[in-house]
Regions:
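Nucleotidyltransferase catalytic core that binds NTPs
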Residues: 1-210
Length: 210
């Protein structure tokens, strides 16, 4: 079963055409090849800090549940990797940003609550795993079928590198699913940075400037 975006409060989305894809995204499309996606019970994976959880994150999570659930025809599984404080420190140049993330256990609880609500219309189950490196279990688990990735160039490069790594290890490449950006009221995409800067709220509504 697919979720109605209007019912979840998602704002309009911005379509990313193939001519706008980064080099890595174009390249990984040639590497998909054989996968287990024909199976009714599928496993989709994605990862991030998910702090604060905003409508852009929700679009990614919805896509993961849709992919794993096979539109309601299978009992799939979603793996959500949550960035550890150590990984956040390694990958974020601004220490203030890392401090603003809050305790890992608190972030995990908030994410679990969100997943309970978002996953309700779907048949797939979910689990949250700790991410201590950028690839996480997606690089090594043979039971994973699909990766849900942001359209951001950095995320697409990692998806391409991940499939290269899996092929080198003798694993099937993952099918990559990339939902379009979710944009705020001003037509610019929703991001955690904009929320932290006080420009918008987690739903993309513009906040009054002082």
């Amino acid at each position: 079963m697919t979720a109605d975006a209007s019912a979840t409060g998602l704002l309009s989305v911005e379509t990313v055409g193939t001519d706008e894809l980064c080099d890595g995204q174009q390249l990984y499309m040639t590497l998909v090849g054989h996968s287990r996606m024909a199976d009714a019970d599928r496993t989709a994976i994605l990862g991030g800090t998910f702090t604060p959880i905003h409508n852009g994150h929700r679009a990614l999570l919805h896509k993961a549940f849709q992919t794993a659930s096979h539109d309601g025809s299978g009992d799939g599984h979603v793996i959500v990797g949550l960035t550890s404080p150590e990984l956040a420190t390694e990958t974020r140049s601004d220490p203030t940003h890392v401090e603003q993330l809050g305790a890992y256990d608190d972030r995990r609880s908030a994410l679990a609550s969100e997943l309970d609500q978002l996953g309700e219309p779907y048949t797939a189950t979910y689990e949250i795993v700790r991410l201590d490196d950028t690839q996480g279990p997606a690089a090594t688990r043979a039971d994973v079928d699909a990766l849900v990735a942001s359209p951001e160039a950095k995320a697409q490069r990692r998806a391409y590198e991940l499939n290269q790594q899996r092929r080198d290890a003798g694993l099937h490449p993952l099918e990559i699913h990339t939902p379009p950006f979710v944009v705020a009221e001003d037509g610019t995409r929703i991001s955690s940075t904009r929320i932290r800067n006080g420009e918008i709220d987690v739903h993309g509504r513009l906040l009054a400037s002082e």
